């Protein structure tokens, strides 16, 4: 029994590249100065068979840098979650971001990004490999699981993607987006007490 725990602990501490670190957080909190947070999510409506992704990049002051809703062609939420991470990373890189923490409420995908020996579901394998490759272009890239309650902003962005016809870049002045960010921040302060 002790040997199993030790082996599990050893595997948990194993890191093969800078892009494969994962942590778990109970709530959203800002990044360190000079770094950014990328939150990602996907949404699927079985009735209309439409799906979409949402992602948001924020700086250490909790200021929204990029907020995007994008309809995607997928009838599987797992594929959508992986696509959201990949699209978010590509967008962050195109904006010049070099240090980022990727946060998602999909523990399975985050775990696969952390542990290369953990095989992802075959339907997302190519996307996970893309994410690993893309993240290698960043100076620092970490992956972190957060619960859905701390990911409400991008949940909203992903749901909005179901009602738009194409990629939508949301302005920082969008009152709903600002309200959602404030609620995520409040959940952080409540959980830290």
Protein language model features and the residues they cover:
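Primary recognition of RNase H-like, Mg2+-dependent phosphodiesterase/nuclease domains
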Residues: 1-193
């Amino acid at each position: 029994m002790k040997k199993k725990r030790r082996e599990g602990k050893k595997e948990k501490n194993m890191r093969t590249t800078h892009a494969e670190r994962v942590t778990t957080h109970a709530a959203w909190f800002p990044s360190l100065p000079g770094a950014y947070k990328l939150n990602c999510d996907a949404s699927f409506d079985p009735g209309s068979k439409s799906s979409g992704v949402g992602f948001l990049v924020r700086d250490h002051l909790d200021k929204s840098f990029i907020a995007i809703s994008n309809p995607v062609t997928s009838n599987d939420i797992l594929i959508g979650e992986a696509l959201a991470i990949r699209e978010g990373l590509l967008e962050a890189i195109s904006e010049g971001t070099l240090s980022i923490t990727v946060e998602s409420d999909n523990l399975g995908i985050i775990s696969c990004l952390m542990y290369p020996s953990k095989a992802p579901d075959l339907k997302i394998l190519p996307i996970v490999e893309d994410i690993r490759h893309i993240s290698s272009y960043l100076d620092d890239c970490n992956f972190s699981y957060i619960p859905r309650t701390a990911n409400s902003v991008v949940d909203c962005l992903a749901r909005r993607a179901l009602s738009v016809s194409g990629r939508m870049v949301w302005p920082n002045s969008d009152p709903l987006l600002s309200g959602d960010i404030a609620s995520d921040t409040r959940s952080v302060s409540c959980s830290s007490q």
